[in-house]
Amino acid sequence: MNKTYTEISGWIVERIAHHAELEPRQITLDTEIVNFRLDSLLMVNITSELEEWLGMDLSPSIFWEMGTIGATTEWILENQEA
């Protein structure tokens, strides 16, 4: 079953908040991913977890390519299989 915008963005916010040692409420969907200062290996691991949760393949660099949580979520929504 496809996930909603709120489900996907919430999942990403929770993971980034955890690893960046922030409260989820401190993270906005339009903040550039690079501002969270998470290393590329960690972001690849988050992407791998996200792939498993979504049941779809993602580019290991999707967060860097899309730039923000909001843009990443939009891309996922547009590319989920119906």
Language model features: what each stretch is:
Residues 39-67:
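Phosphopantetheinylated carrier protein domains
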Residues 1-25, 74-82:
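Thiotemplate assembly-line natural product biosynthesis machinery
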Residues 18, 34, 52:
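Short polybasic/polar patches that bind polyanions
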Residues 32, 68-71:
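Residue-level recognition of oxygen-bearing side chains
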Residues 24, 33, 63:
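N-terminal sensory regulatory modules of PAS/LOV and PAS-like folds
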